[in-house]
């Protein structure tokens, strides 16, 4: 049976592993290394280099050497993070159909295509190691990758000729590799700080089950950012000394990047190191050399705020899981950047627990992916992974209310269905605005996408039944569909993720939801009251048309007057809750005679049965544009 390889497709380095002989083993690449630089280069001769060969020539070919492509995977070109990446990366980032792509020698490549070249290299090396074709893989992604980023990763695998059996979250994968599923029931925290992304996840493990309780992170925080702090510091020092800005010279900047990365690594074991770059640039007076000593203390001061950001996210995720620091039994450190002493020190101080560093942080995620591959192939028995939705999902309904369909923290895969209806008579279509967030009003949440369901037969408002289904698969990819139950017509959208959320946005949204909870509840109550008032006016007018000859003309005038008064109040957008309630009460009271006439007709058997009415009561008015 063909082997499934587990792949950690990293920002700076990638790794692969395979499950064989009842254990997961790291596969070395053709160069004999356990990790492969996630770098692709295009030479003037038309060659494409991947991994170590690409890294070696980066200094002399910065414009055609692509690294950290994961940072723009699934990113829209107009996002702030794309602009930030443009400033930092020496190659050209361009707009391709609204999404980020790279331009090399007048040719445009998507992040999926670049990533696919890395995956192809890993695939070929795995085939060489195993002595057989490799066609299936499990690929890991940061827990906080949005739908677009997950899809882009899967597409990269497809381009590389791999059937991606599962996209698995990196912290969950790490928990498998540490064998945490075999222990007694415990609450585990995985702190994953890699080259370009940060994840923190709280899991409950034991009895062969790994269940995610809460997750958070930042898709744009990692070792690259630590390197950038050294680059900025060294460039500023050089500018102060020589009056030359190295950031305007891409070749000098690439040399400085390599030196900064090496300095960072050396400072994990040494108290001081030297950045020594002879002939870094030149001016009219001759060549210039950059020679700067940097101490560990200086490096720690440069990155202190970034480390504190990770601590804040730990605090947020533990709270989101409904736990306190004392509930955490074990802290697992994952990712190359966790080798930095200051990172270890701060995490240990915050959690007050010794850190689990028993597995190589660069390899652990790939090992876990290989174990998951074994699970999917049936080679590993009785292991169950349970991931969760990070935020609630729903749609916009009448009056701009956000109606939740899938609550935050629901275990995936999941499928939820809810029935909605039309807001106006003879409405031919409904517009579905898919939302993500915890706020009561649609405008305060994130819109993930919109689609229309048309061809609804003419019918009074509230009669059509529109079945809206949210389907989240095991990869965390969302599909939303809407179906008119009468005609069977349906429409669906696979959420593009163009409005995907960073963890900072998540935290902000959750905090805002808490902060504005009372205010939101009041606003929602007013909107619902207005919806009820509008519905009452509609039903009263309809009943009046049908039964006005059954009641006295004086009663008809009273009802018409009360309807007009309520309509006038509804025209006032600032009408208070009390005003609305008073007018609703008045119309309800004067309409008693009308209700009696309607009831008398129903008793006569000319009205539809109560079962239909009861069914309609459960239908929610859908917002239509």
Swiss-Prot record:
Region (Disordered): 598-625
Induction context: By stress conditions e.g. heat shock.
Superkingdom of the source species: Bacteria
GO MF, any single term: ATP binding
Residue(s) carrying Phosphothreonine: 197
Signal sequence coordinates: none
Protein's UniProt keywords contain Ion transport: no
Keyword set, alphabetical order: ATP-binding, Chaperone, Nucleotide-binding, Phosphoprotein, Stress response
Gene3D superfamilies hit by this protein: 1.20.1270.10, 3.30.420.40, Actin, Chain A, domain 4, Substrate Binding Domain Of DNAk, Chain A, domain 1
Keyword Zinc found: no
Family per similarity comment: Belongs to the heat shock protein 70 family.
Annotated function: Acts as a chaperone.
Name recorded for this polypeptide: Chaperone protein DnaK
Originating species: Helicobacter hepaticus (strain ATCC 51449 / 3B1)
Gene that this sequence comes from: dnaK
